Amino acid sequence: MPSETIDSTKQFEFQISDWNSYHELDQEEEEKYVIQLFGRTEDDHDVCLKVTGYTPFFYVEIPKQWKQRQVDKFVEILKNKVQYHCKKNLDEDFDLSKSLIKYAMVKKHKFYNFRNKQLYNFLLLVFKSHTAMKEFSSILARPLEAKGLTNKPMLYQRYESNIEPHIRFMHINNLSSCGWASIDKDKLKKIPEYSNCDYSFSVNWKDVKPSNNDDRMAPFKIMGYDIECVSCDQNFPQAERPSDKIIQIGITMYRYGSMKCYEQHILTLKKCAPIEGVNVECYKKEKGLLRGFAKKIAELRPDFKTGYNNFGFDDKYIYDRILRIDKREGKKQGVNINALKNKFMDEILRTIGKVNNNYLIENEGLDRIPIYTTVKDKKISSKASRFIQIRGGTYVENGNNLKYVQSPGITYFEVKNLSSSALGDNELKFIQIPGVLSIDMMKVIQRDHRLIGYKLDNVSANFITEKADKIIEMPHNQEDSDSEKEDEDTDDKTYDVNIYTKSTKALEKDSYIQIMVNDGYSSSPLSEGAKYKVYDIQTITEKKLNEKTNKEEIFVYQAIKTKICQKDIQQLRETIKNPLLGISWTFAKDDMHHTKINEYFEEGDPKKIRQIAKYCLKDCKLVNLLLAKLEIIVNSVGMAKVCHVPLSYLFLRGQGVKIFSLVSKKCREKNFLIPVLRRKSKDNEGDEDETYEGATVITPKPNVYLSPIGVLDYSSLYPNSMRERNLSQECYVDDSKYDNLPGYIYHDVEIILKDKKGKILRNIDGTPQKEYHRFAQEIITDEQINRELKDIFDKINTVFENNVAIIQNQKYFTEKNISELIDKHKNISDSKIEDIEFDESLSDKRKNKLVDAEKDSLDKNIGFYQKIKSQIDKIKLDSKIEIDNLSKNLNEEEKSKQINKMELNTKNLISKVFSKYLITEQQREELIVLEKERAKRSVNAEKAKVYNTVDGITVRYGILPEILTELLNKRKETNGKLANEKDPFVKAILNALQLAFKVTANSLYGQTGAPTSPLYFIAIAACTTAIGRERLHYAKKTVEDNFPGSEVIYGDSVTGDTPIITRHQNGDINITTIEELGSKWKPYEIFKAHEKNSNRKFKQQSQYPTDSEVWTAKGWAKIKRVIRHKTVKKIYRVLTHTGCIDVTEDHSLLDPNQNIIKPINCQIGTELLHGFPESNNVYDNISEQEAYVWGFFMGDGSCGSYQTKNGIKYSWALNNQDLDVLNKCKKYLEETENIQFKILDTMKSSSVYKLVPIRKIKYMVNKYRKIFYDNKKYKLVPKEILNSTKDIKNSFLEGYYAADGSRKETENMGCRRCDIKGKISAQCLFYLLKSLGYNVSINIRSDKNQIYRLTFSNKKQRKNPIAIKKIQLMNETSNDHDGDYVYDLETESGSFHAGVGEMIVKNTDSIFINFHIKDENGEEKTDKEALMKTIAKCQRAAKLINQNVPKPQSIVYEKTLHPFILVAKKKYVGLLFEKSPDKYFLKSMGIVLKRRDNAPIVKIVVGGIIDNILKNRDIDKAIEYTKIVLDKLMNGEYPMDKFIISKTLKSRYKKPSTIAHKVLADRMAVRDPGNKPQINDRIPFVYIVKDMGKKKKKDILQGDLIEHPEYVIANNLKIDYLYYLEHQIINPASQILELMMDTKDVQKFFNKYIIDEQNKRKGAQSLTKWMDFSKLPKESGSKTAKKPYQSQKLQKTKSSNKSQIDPKYINLIKNKSRKHECQNMNKWISSTDKCTDDWEPIVE
């Protein structure tokens, strides 16, 4: 019975669990809005609160010139429109226009667009009912004709009519949605008949206030329930069949925070034998059982009810059975079902729940209020629906079914369609009970967790599991031993076993477990199908030595006591001995098939009925345990509080409503109104197809990285990006009128536009289309800050003064003092050591000496304090051990007394220690300084919570940034509490809260970019990602600039024939192509592997001699290495007047300020960085005569050799039409070469004369080929000329121009020009001309892209020499043989000269950091020391970035990946180290190890390959492992569970016949209609071998090749192993193997298995088995196979197709055996902590 009294305190407080709203009829028979609040008090009484008097409202924007007269007229017109609409469409007697009870003009700010705090005119409309509010809003959604006010229909903008009234009530009263409410007891009116709760009150809405104590949880009641049904056949039960009745309903009751079931009920048909601890109620008929269930819920009054798939099966089955009873009764009486006087549905729904439904119907007229609902109209089509009005408690036709309609004020059955990215399409069918929140655990787990399957047994095994730390066989007593001897040869003998584990949460005594064995790649049962009963669970405490700290520590275990049979115990012993295998236990659901339930129920034996009942109750308990284990309630409460929405919204609504409530609450506080956004129709014009450049993702670089790769990560990048530039709707500047106003600063953001498909939109000239957005931010003065934060600053000052007073008066230290002083000195010392270690001017020896000295200094400074601390720590440890070892026989009271006594003794001992040490005045002053620093930090922290600082100016946040600031600050505060909290109960609450803050902050950005969101504002979403990109690039640049030698692994490339200017250490300048800089190519694993079309095998490097330099933006700089790789990419030619270069589309060019710019972002007129070296004019060992001849040869000379039948012939000639010029050359040649020459008349045949040598032709050819030609037969200006005096250079130019100048000297054009073929030739001539002082411009021919025209003059160039004049798409690199090689340089300066002319480009850049840690010999290290240094440098880099990055951005060191396999974009796996080089775990993302649409066999194969590469760094072992598992696979040695795939069944498909699991689901529905798969179910299936007859392969559908696992077993079908190999394994395995092997070798490797299986199916023997290869030498398919190494000559032969060692791994070979350069790598790996995840990848 409800209690009549409450305690004597003044305030009545309870925690809210559920919200509901409905309408009652007032005295005028009009609807009146009512809010219901349900909850529970701290002393465990449930509450129902009827909140009255709240009136829904919304706003309409009205013209600024309107006065009261116009407003009155407008309201009159609006009311008339509503009245007309009601009469036309609704009940004529029900006029909603009368429900408008108040209206008024108000002034508010608009939320959208910056208006400098301007107030606008709005009309506030207040209503009696939410129904009326929606009707008025609906009228205003369309243009309204207001005669007398406007000449034509106008659209009046609505504001906040889309905020639900009870949400707005929550905002106004500042209530926490599921926190604690507080009401003055004088304001409460008792209405005990209103509900069945302990307390039923009515209260005015203004009197409901928030409690001051919200960090607590009421002892909520949680009901788990499950139904059992029988079937008239062997198929699954179907509710519409008369005999498929509900035979049992189980109920288990738990309290929030407890794992113990305090009450159990089983309602059953037929007699049931008693069950200990269970209330058994037996019924003769199903109707009585259902009536009993309704009464039981009313009696128990739970706050939450939960089941498993209860939204998909249980509630709907109950509803359908009740409906069937009404149908049968109507048929029996011969009346329509609605004519029944006492409908069973009415009885059940009025009985069930907390509210007294009969009272609401009789006293508040709920049955007379019209309800508006949508029903399917089968007369139109199967999908058509219509909107109808009906009274409560009525059945209506809904397609082929009946729908029961009831008022939302009382219990009703609801069918809700919910679509979300997390859940997909869902139809939720459930009984909605006001005050009892319904949760379907299956839907929750589907939303939050990606599992292979969602059957209850799979889910429970997945979550109720733990690693077995050790397993101990317990000794038997003599009696047991004797009996065992007698039964020694039997399998019935069992062994007592204790499984020690960290936690057994959600595991109970008498439940069952399975023992799982993990080989690193997948888990399998110790014995297939074996389950072991849990006989007991005990807590065991052990004292052990921690090997790392060398200290004794207390370890607490949970020991699971079970029994294992002899066969399994032997297997368990062998498993325990194997160090490579891991053991865990999982919950094993004690399942009962529905056919067995049928059988037992038919027998009717009370004991058999009891077995069904026990099974039913176990499922109820299991759901409760899962709810507690996954902390669903506390996490959901945290999220609901943060977002200000009822708890039920988290289970029944999408993401948008949460963020909308959060923002609308803040807007209300700031006097802003949010408009109701109009959705654009498809026919409307607009830019809805335009999107913005999305999130920045690091360009993928697929490879196996052996060097440590450090990763830095911005904290809350997107939320902080919004805060950094004040991105908020009301700050957006869209009108120049409000630009550059005093008192504000302005932020500009540039975004790149994309189309709907994500492609960048471009202008006519090819440059990206951009938009520029601006946001205003208010400046705030110090006076304002001190005024607004006065109370907070006063509190900080008071705390400071009190603490200083305590310090000045205290004689002895406290624990806090000691800790603070130690931390202070450690922080100072750590900072000094860091500065020393990163001081590049110091040698390693000097660094070590200084670090040792600093450590000695630290020991001296803190030695005194450490001595005290050690004594205190020992006292505390002894006390803990003493408390842990208290006798377990003590009851709770005795135990508590003993603990209190021990703790008091500990405090006394600690006081004695401190009493020995007096504080000196110096130490006292030191403590006071620490207090001052703490107070200063507190002041700055409080300011940062409210304001931001931009360039030294304090500014106020806009609404969205302020919300984000509050969320992030609250998360920080909550984490601070969490770190110090000891109570696990409170810790769970705090952890849920901090997680909710984080998720909500990240979700806010997403809502601004979601078109369906009421907060949609695409500019904010676009600007957020743009700022994020800026921050990432800034971080990258900071690292590059501050860490010399750090390598960046995002490669840019130029073509191989690109000219490069180099300088030898002796000063000689040379011009060569970039491809000729490299020699002795070897693998370069970290370069250029990111490209989509890049062949990862051809990434190579060549170390460049240290005696040469390249010209760069910073002068001459060392070349670290030359890099090349093959790719298939677009090549762009970028031409300025003084520079021309061919680059890949992603190459980084530089602007004059050395900012990076990509070719695709350039346009005509863009200025680029140019620079040119001073010429080297030193050599004079060539005569001017010879230089003239050389120049002539460069212009029109030729030489070479050719094969004839008589042998090799040589030719050398100078060619020209001018005999005078040739005679001049003849004279000079005969003087310098001492050879006779002659002129041949070849005018008729060649139109030129030829000057040729009479003898020594071979000598002339060899000499000129050597100095004039590169390896591609392009002519060069000899380096002797490039470095000679100006006179010699002028002679060379004179000779060249005489031979090939396009204009003669006699032509008076003011300039000269020449055309030359080839980049290298053009650049040589360009350099020559520049060194002679000419201004040279470059042009190109569109018809012949290898011809360059150089125009030179002494006059000043008229046009901007560094501005782009042409951008030309040349072509793609070749598609043949994996593409062409493209090249790059790594230089110390980060840039280099390239191409024809003076252009300087950027070399490689990236976000991933490789610091290239080297040993004393300059060799790169990849060992533990390299890892430690990488971690340290990353931490240092984070500090440097944070010194200059705009607030509130902050970057942190996140992790180091070592080694690291990057497969593709967002697909990687590696060993992740954080701060310790001794602790790591496997980190993976997007790879097959965790994808649900891959069978477990894929994880076994690919996981093993990864394991051997990452842990063992052994390619051969990876190959050998692959062979072993593929042999086992094709021989059928793996169990079927390794081949099960599962996919989600969606509601619609374009071509359902092509969707395999949809076809299977349809087959399953035909075979067993009652067990028909539901929308969003995971459908498990296996590919089977199936004879498809004469069907062509292309005509075979996937759905024909799969079957459900149970069907496969029942029908003894064969698994198609070949399908798994070809379609699931080969692709992901090849992606990794091809990082280290030739593609063709990988193909051969897998083809062997494919051919063998195909032959086997045809009945043919495989070729490999037919032939005897036993005597042939063994070969590995791996490029790194272990094979004898012969002579260099033999290795280079190409006479065989044998796989060769990839050059990348040559350096791993030492003394004819493969070893990594880190010789002790394996020892190091084995010495570190074991993988914390047992090689179960952590997926992002």
Curated annotation (Swiss-Prot):
UniProt-listed InterPro entries: DNA-dir_DNA_pol_B, DNA-dir_DNA_pol_B_exonuc, DNA-dir_DNA_pol_B_multi_dom, DNA/RNA_pol_sf, DNA_pol_B_thumb, DNA_pol_palm_dom_sf, DNA_pol_type-B, Hint_dom_sf
Post-translational modification: This protein undergoes a protein self splicing that involves a post-translational excision of the intervening region (intein) followed by peptide ligation.
Compositional bias of kind Acidic residues: 480-491
Leader sequence residues: none
Compositional bias annotation for Polar residues: 1685-1700
Pfam families cross-referenced by the UniProt entry: DNA_pol_B (PF00136), DNA_pol_B_exo1 (PF03104)
Record-given protein name: DNA polymerase
Biological source species: Acanthamoeba polyphaga mimivirus
Encoding gene per record: POLB
